[in-house]
Amino acid sequence: MDKARIDQIIDKHNADPSSLIQVMLEIQGEKHWLPKYVLEQVSERLQVPLTRIQHIATFYKAFSLVPKGRHEINVCVGTACHVRGASRILDTLTELTGIKAGETDLELKYSLETVNCVGCCALGPVMEIDGKIFGNVTPTETIDLLKNYK
């Protein structure tokens, strides 16, 4: 992401310091992570101390300071999903992608995370890919679903 695009996003929010989180979310949505040069530019343009921006970026799980994959996969490991086989879904994803929960593959294709609950307990086990929820997922369905996210 070039500096001009970052400026466009900031300008869209009128360079208003109160829009900091929205600006960060929009950049994160396009870049999939927040490199230091991005944080520095946002700090300068919004007149918000870099330390405050770094605090926000490390406090909220929505933000990442390390590169993430193009496809973000979340597997619910809450109680309902756990008892319905979430660990088998995680094992299948690890086998298919070569990464464990909390990791991103070297090609920056996939990032795999666990979440405590996505609020769809009746549909467990639940997997989310790029914000789309899939319920009652089996290991076989996991294989088929992942084929759609190359």
Feature-to-residue mapping (PLM):
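Signature of N-terminal electron-transfer/Fe-S-associated modules in redox systems
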Residues: M1-K150
